[in-house]
Amino acid sequence: MDTNTLLLILANIIVIIGLARLIGLLFARFQQPPVIGEIIAGIMLGPSLLGLLSPALEKSFFPATTQPFLYLLSEIGLIFYMFLVGLELNPQYLRQKLKVAILTSNVSIFFPFVLGIVLSFFVLYSLNQPNKTSFIPFALFIGAAMSITAFPVLARILKDTGLDKTPLGTLGLTCASVDDISAWCLLAIAIAVTRTDNIFGAFPTLLGIIVYTVFMVTLGRKFFKYILRNYGQKNYLSQGLLTFIYIMVILSAMLTEWIGIDVIFGGFILGAILPKNTNLSTELATKTEDFVSTFLLPIFFAYSGLSTDLGLLNKPYLWAVCALVVAAAIAGKYCGVYVTTRALGVEKQEAKALGWLMNTRGLTELIILNVGLKLGVISPVIFTMFVIMAIITTIITSPLVVKIYPAPAH
């Protein structure tokens, strides 16, 4: 790497994290999750705004020579973000209203997933898709992208609106926890099928990830309990222990990539099996989250923004398809949640609010889309449409939930 490239990468990082922080704070002032502002900041640095205003500046500031380095940093950011998602997956949520949560979450995945598959028939052959895209992998990715709920963003919305301690907050966190596990399993299947190009060929990969997950949940969990109990210095997370855990996160990511699933699953699995509700786990989350959220994730948003080009939607027909994607995603999730919870005896207002809460997609949607784009399953046009869907479904959540189900403080 020559000096000019190094300086340009450092300049990229300065602009990326600075703009992400600025736009994130701006959105927070309007009671929106800062992550939405950070996603939009990334889009602003790509062809949708910077490239539109000055194509020459965009190409010179984000040339092809720097993008591999941004990609590497964004992948590392995703590994550790997924580690945090797993770490925050608290078992106490899974024990509360479990029957309602399991039924609601699975139906709320099934409805939009089916709509996604139906939509795939239309989208695959009518839009400019990669030539070698097969229907089954494409449909699985579209279904997964329509079905996901962003647990961390949902938790942040509940906290910011003062609803985290209410019955709605408890049920929402429980449903989102179950939804998270189910949706990541669905994505794992989509990746396995895509990489082998057929369902039966994916069986060895799926068997491998099942064996690894079972191993981590049983022996791995016991091992880390022992490590944290014996090497945590009076509930203090030493640099040595922190280093060991980070090495294990990367090693777990390497193993899931080697098995044939994406690196993000390694981070998620390791975070999920670590002991929860201890001073050490809290300190681990705190030390990790600040650097990941302020430095690494904005780079991921910027890298995603370079692939998001609103200019690709240059015909009314394409915007109509985009509107159809947004409508199907919202309707599938909302109807799945509302119908199920009402059938299970949940009050009408709570069921309505939960339907909108579970529509929160945010950053989690971006992760699925980037995996699909990386594997060549979805085109930049479809990528852009689903990024728009992720932003819209997340932006509308807070105001609608507060209007339907105001917290006691309101």
Swiss-Prot record:
It is found in: Membrane. InterPro entries: Cation/H_exchanger_TM (IPR006153), CPA2_transporter (IPR050794), Na+/solute_symporter_sf (IPR038770). One of its GO terms (cellular component) is membrane. It is a multi-pass membrane protein. Gene3D superfamilies: 1.20.1530.20. One of its GO terms (molecular function) is antiporter activity. Keywords: Antiport, Ion transport, Membrane, Sodium, Sodium transport, Transmembrane, Transmembrane helix, Transport. One of its GO terms (biological process) is proton transmembrane transport. Its main location: membrane. The chain crosses the membrane at residues 7-27, 33-53, 69-89, 107-127, 135-155, 173-193, 199-219, 241-261, 291-311, 319-339, 376-396. Na(+)/H(+) antiporter. PANTHER family: CATION/H + ANTIPORTER, K(+)_H(+) ANTIPORTER 1. Belongs to the monovalent cation:proton antiporter 2 (CPA2) transporter (TC 2.A.37) family. This is Na(+)/H(+) antiporter NhaS4. It comes from Synechocystis sp. (strain ATCC 27184 / PCC 6803 / Kazusa). The gene is nhaS4.
